[in-house]
Each structure stands twice: as C-alpha cells, then as structure tokens.
Amino acid sequence: MPQMFRQGRFWVQLCVVVALIAFAGLLINNITVNLIRTGLGLDFGWLWRPAGFALAETALPYAPTDSYAWALTVGWLNSLKVILMGLLLATTLGVAAGAARSSRNRLLRSLSGGYVALIRQVPLLLQLLFWYFVAFLGLPDTPVGGLIHFSNQGIRLLGLNLSVEFCSVLTGLVVFTGASIAEIVRGGINAVSRGQWEAFRSLGLSEGLGLRRIVLPQALPAILPALTSQYLNLAKNSTLAIAV
C-alpha cells in the first residue's frame, strides 16, 4: 500500500472532498427542483420574460412590460451613472475637505474635522435612508428654485431630470466617500516635508497656490493607492441603492 494511504491526513482530506461534492450535488438538486416548481428552468429564457416592475431612474426608455434583460441593462447603466458622478463629486469634496484640514484657518480645520468625524461614524445605509426620507422627500411638492428646480418629485438641473432616489444615493455616496478621501488627502499632505511649505511661503506664494503647485503633486504618490481603494468601495457601496 502506498505510503500516503497510511497517513491519517490523507483520509481526512478525502472525506472533506467527498463531503463538499455531496453538498454541491444536493444544492444543485434543490435549486433545480425549486426552479421547476416555480415554472422556471436552468436556461436563460427568463431573461426575455416581462420584468413586471418599475424603475424610478432610467437612462433609457423602460416600462414594466419590458424584459428582464432590458431591466438589467437599464439598471447597469444607472449604476454606471451614479458611480461615475460619485467618483467625480466625492474626489472634489474629499480633496477640498482634506486641504481644509491642513489649513492655517482654524474655522476651516474645525469644520472639515467635524464633517469627517461625524460622517465616518455613521453607517452608510443609515445615511442613505436619511437623505431619502428626511432630506429629499421633505422638499416641497411644487418645484422651487431658478436654474435648479427642487421638489420631492426630483431635481431638474441643466436639462437633467434626476429622481429623488438617484439624488439620495448619489448624495450619500459622495458625502460618505468624500470623508474618507479627505483623510487620505490630509495624510498625503502631512507626508510632504515641512520644508516644502516653508519654501513656497518664502517665495511669496499663497497657501492655495502653494498647495496646488508644490504640495499636492508631491503628495499624490502617497494618496493614489488608498484613493483607488475608496473608488472601489464607492462602486461596491452603490449596490445599497436597493434600500431606496
């Protein structure tokens, strides 16, 4: 008998593999039986059946009578839109808040610090529900505003009609991710030698100009890895839109 058959570890591993195969077979059998019981199958024919539900935000024309495949396509485009807009706005907010945390102005430091501390302590799902039920559904029934029209039916901006659901998800993602980006930017700025700050001040450059031209370019290598992680988190967190 080969040596490996005499080892107890081999038989333990064999039993584990057999158990996993049996569990997978049982799982597949249960799925097949339940799908047949509900009138579905293991094919993709269900994709062409009527979806039967409405979507609050649609980048393309959609009706409940359209197929599941079209509903998935429209939903994918909605996710892509909120992710791209969220990345742009969250980066802008995060860089501004991170720069403010490194400012000499005590008021700016306090405001940005309070924003980061508050937002990072509250779960994102709770923030999304707040923006939806309290902030946007609390808007007036009739549109108000000039260039931007606000109402609890949605927001109209530069020819774009955004539903309250989309605005709630976008605002929540931007505010939440922006707080994390602010901390990343602050850390990157603090990693730059203080001599660089003294150098641009000695040249008579303003704080803002020195930050943009001297400090931030040097802080970028330290910021990018963590910033990429936050971008991925924003994309994953966009799935919480199902809550609103």
What are these model-derived regions, one by one?
Residues M1-V244:
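Transmembrane alpha-helices and adjacent helix-loop boundaries
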